[in-house]
Swiss-Prot record:
Heme a3 binds at H415. Residues 1-15, 76-97, 158-190, 247-272, 336-343, 398-405, 473-490, 605-610 are extracellular. It catalyses: 2 a quinol + O2 = 2 a quinone + 2 H2O. There is a cross-link at H280-Y284 (1'-histidyl-3'-tyrosine (His-Tyr)). This is Quinol oxidase subunit 1. Pathway: Energy metabolism; oxidative phosphorylation. GO terms for molecular function: copper ion binding; cytochrome-c oxidase activity; heme binding; oxidoreductase activity, acting on diphenols and related substances as donors, oxygen as acceptor. Cu cation binds at H280, Y284, H329, H330. Belongs to the heme-copper respiratory oxidase family. Catalyzes quinol oxidation with the concomitant reduction of oxygen to water. Major component for energy conversion during vegetative growth. GO terms for cellular component: plasma membrane. The chain crosses the membrane at residues 16-34, 57-75, 98-117, 140-157, 191-209, 228-246, 273-292, 316-335, 344-362, 378-397, 406-425, 453-472, 491-510, 585-604, 611-631.
Length: 649
């Protein structure tokens, strides 16, 4: 790639110029605030180097919300372009760039980190653990994700964004058809972030299997913990495939290999297969934790034990197995034999069965329950019908013969947005609001929260339901404009109105965070909603102490904390206080991730010397870690007593 220095910064587009100015001003403002209030040491010692799973979870969530804003703006720009025929708001290349970054950001850099953030905050508390199995690795997982996300996101101001779609199909993603650094940003940003996700999968799988408190058998675990465990198993099996695929395509682009190009025997369809062998399990990586969140919320606010617990566990396991047997349904039209299409059509339909089991379990959990219509519960209730719509249309798409009509139309676009927004995004909002007091010590305002819910949910349906009809009328996806005689103007305009309603809803959420920080009553009991059933509600609010539990609880039933409340069990008797061993903070994961970012940035522009320097930095950090003998530290009994006294005041 012959890179021209005068093209280093993207210029000539007022939207990108505005983004560059806002980034510069935001950076200056952050530096000024940290310097003025003398918070640099606090930022380093309390957040950047922390190994506390709760703080890392909050950092994941903050990053995900920022990515939600970026990906949401991309989506609004696409809808603005398609609102009217022959619109010139975006040119074709800019639209393709936004189309690519929107999909990649929303799935890889928003949905996954949001859920991983909630998992970090909640799951160790739910199983009665002091921290995760590998705290150092947890910090490294976050920073590799964050650096990968930042590497991907700087592409729109430095060098140029990828424009081959979020799936980066070959040969469209080849050097001939996608010259420049954009596609390299995609490959290396995802590679670095994917390493962090794989480490998270290993970490939480070990944590759940080996660090549960006394009495917590597998069949006493909360459903969110169960869905997390199965999700981590999927990650461990699926993400190595993505890692290999990204590496092979990187070799094609950077070193002239031909794994996916027709020259020298390469196979473009091999990329499609490898991508979707990872890609469809990825759908369940972001859906299964959402199922767990809704299970916790519905059970709590219906004030009933989850109906069909064993059936729920079985359905989760069935979904995880079938998720690896459906990938070809993404390209029924791309030359498979009838027998191959038939097999994957059957497996795709079959996966709807365990999903349907869960829907009925949630409905029966609410049956005859004393339901409180709180904001989290509203999101859970909205999820069920909207997700069913997405699921039913998914079964329609699973019919290989019919898919020839639906494929690459807006019918498909509407389907996966009904699944991913109604499933994953609704769950992110519900879980965020539900566990918000656990993280920050106060609830979000319910009145403002309900405005957010109704505007966003109604806007979502106004935006995406018309797209089913656009698809049936033949509107293909990925087009940046259309003619006035195509007959798509009215539905596209309605869809755009709905998209901007969703944007307004997000702004209301941001206002709610500010308003609640200023005016909400501080909550210290830990059981913020008064309906807590699991051990996460047995700890204090506003980031529980690093050690989580002054005394590790003993579990005697499925809804452990509810049982303790009913039995009036003393949670933390001082007579049982013992000194607690905790892991030390470390800054090395941060520096290792920066080295990864340096290597990635160098390889994006094919500056191999910079790539080598960055990789040497990564290796050096690993070597130094190998010679580090840090046995952590102990929290004394007196310190535990003082901490618990302050919590109870």
């Amino acid at each position: 790639m012959k890179f021209k220095w005068d093209e280093f910064f993207v210029t000539g587009d007022p939207l990108i110029l505005g983004a560059q100015v806002s980034i510069a001003l935001s950076t200056i403002a952050i530096i000024f605030v940290l310097t003025y209030f003398k918070k640099w040491k606090w930022l380093w010692s309390e957040w950047i180097t922390t190994v506390d799973h709760k703080k890392l979870g909050i950092m994941y969530i903050i990053s995900a919300v920022i990515m939600l804003f970026r990906g949401g703006v991309d989506g609004l720009m696409m809808r603005a372009q398609l609102a009217l025929p022959n619109n010139s708001f975006l040119d074709s290349n800019h639209y393709n760039e936004i189309f690519t970054t929107h999909g990649t950001i929303m799935i890889i850099f928003m949905a996954m980190p949001f859920l991983i953030g909630l998992i970090n905050v909640v799951v160790p508390l739910q199983i009665g653990a002091r921290d995760v199995a590998f705290p150092y690795l947890n910090n490294l997982s976050f920073w590799t994700f964050f650096v990968g996300a930042m590497l991907f996101n700087i592409s729109f101001v430095i060098g140029g964004s990828p424009n081959a779609g979020w799936t980066s199909y070959m040969p469209l993603a080849s050097n001939d058809m996608s010259p420049g650094p954009g596609e390299n940003y995609y490959l290396l940003g995802l590679q670095i972030a994917g390493i962090g996700t794989l480490m998270t999968g290993i970490n939480f799988m070990v944590t759940i299997l080996k660090m549960r408190t006394k009495g917590m058998t597998l069949m006493r675990m909360p459903m969110f913990t169960w869905t997390t465990l199965i999700t981590m198993v999927i990650i461990v099996f699926a993400f190595p495939v993505l890692t290999v695929a990204l590496a092979l395509l990187s070799f094609d682009r950077l070193f002239g290999a031909h794994f996916f190009t027709l020259e020298a025997g390469g196979m473009p369809m091999l990329w499609a297969n490898l991508f979707w062998i990872w890609g469809h399990p990825e759908v369940y990586i972001v859906i299964l934790p959402a199922f767990g969140i809704f299970s916790e919320i519905i059970s709590s606010f219906a004030r009933k034990q989850l109906f069909g617990y064993k059936a729920m566990v079985g359905s989760i396991i069935a979904i995880s197995v079938l998720s690896f047997l459906v990938w070809t349904h993404h390209f029924f039209t791309m030359g498979n034999s009838a027998s191959v299409n038939s097999f994957f059509s059957i497996t795709t339909m079959a996966i709807s069965i365990p999903t349907g089991v869960k829907i009925f379990n949630w409905l029966f959990t609410m049956y005859k329950g004393r339901i409180s219509f709180t904001t989290p519960m509203l999101w859970a209730l909205a999820f069920i019908p909207n997700f069913v719509i997405g699921g039913v249309t998914g079964v329609m798409l699973a019919m290989a013969a019919a898919d020839y009509q639906y494929h690459n139309t807006y019918f498909l676009v509407s389907h996966f947005h009904y699944v991913l927004i109604a499933g994953t995004v609704f769950a992110c909002f519900a879980g965020f609001i539900f566990w918000y007091p656990k993280m920050f010590g106060h609830k979000l305002n319910e009145r403002i929260g309900k405005w957010f819910f109704w505007i966003f949910m109604i806007g979502f349906n106004i935006c995406f339901f018309p797209q089913y009809f656009l698809g049936l009328q033949g509107m293909p996806r990925r087009i940046y404009t259309y003619g006035p005689n195509d007959g798509w103007t009215t539905l596209n305009f309605i869809s755009t109105v709905g998209a901007f309603m969703m944007g307004v809803g997000f702004l209301i959420l941001c206002y709610n965070i500010y308003y609640s920080f200023r005016y909400s009553t501080r909550e210290i009991s830990g059981d913020s909603w008064g309906v807590g059933r699991t051990l996460d509600w047995a700890t204090s609010s506003a980031i529980p102490p690093h050690y989580n539990f002054a005394v590790l609880p003993e579990v005697k039933s499925q809804d452990a904390f509810l049982h303790m409340k009913e039995e009036k069990t003393e949670l933390y008797p001082e007579s049982k206080f013992k000194k607690i061993h905790m892991p030390s903070n470390s800054g090395r994961p941060f520096f290792m991730s920066v080295a990864f970012g340096l290597a990635g940035f160098g390889l994006v522009f094919e500056w191999y010397w910079m790539g080598v320097v960055g990789l040497i930095g990564v290796l050096l950090c690993m070597v130094l870690r190998s010679f580090e003998y840090d046995n952590g530290y102990y929290i004394s009994v007196d310190e535990i007593k003082e901490t618990e006294r302050k919590i109870s005041e």
